[in-house]
């Protein structure tokens, strides 16, 4: 089984999607799902002394303008593990440019954590935490000599639109999955 190609994007897209976690919160290791084999590989260890502030992964059967599956960040109180599948509710969209490529990311919360039951949109997230995420992504590739431009945040509706677009981009690239 290849979770990138064989899992659905979610049980109720775009309201609830599957987040396939590659990197747990607190890690400096950047893991990436190999799109051909479905195995997890160590892409690199971050050059900076930063740690991922969220669980980080992809939405299965999506594709984005940066030439990779669509990224998703899940706010977790405790880190999960690589290859964990989380039912996640999109609440925002983080907009950034990575070395000239549009590299937007969905921000989501786990459906199965009652702590986040009232978090429906980006306005429900403390600004200090959004600033922490933005700071991480602005600086995490700095010692590699790569330029990141942070464009800011949008709400849940923007995230849902981009998810649907990323599903269509997957179909265009890989064909329809029956």
UniProtKB/Swiss-Prot annotation:
Catalytic activity: diphosphate + H2O = 2 phosphate + H(+)
Binding site for substrate: 30, 44, 56, 140
Broad class of enzyme this protein falls into: hydrolase
Cellular component annotations (GO), alphabetically ordered: cytoplasm
An annotated Gene Ontology molecular function: inorganic diphosphate phosphatase activity
Subunit structure: Homohexamer.
Function: Catalyzes the hydrolysis of inorganic pyrophosphate (PPi) forming two phosphate ions.
Stated name of the protein: Inorganic pyrophosphatase
Organism this protein belongs to: Pyrococcus horikoshii (strain ATCC 700860 / DSM 12428 / JCM 9974 / NBRC 100139 / OT-3)
Gene field: ppa
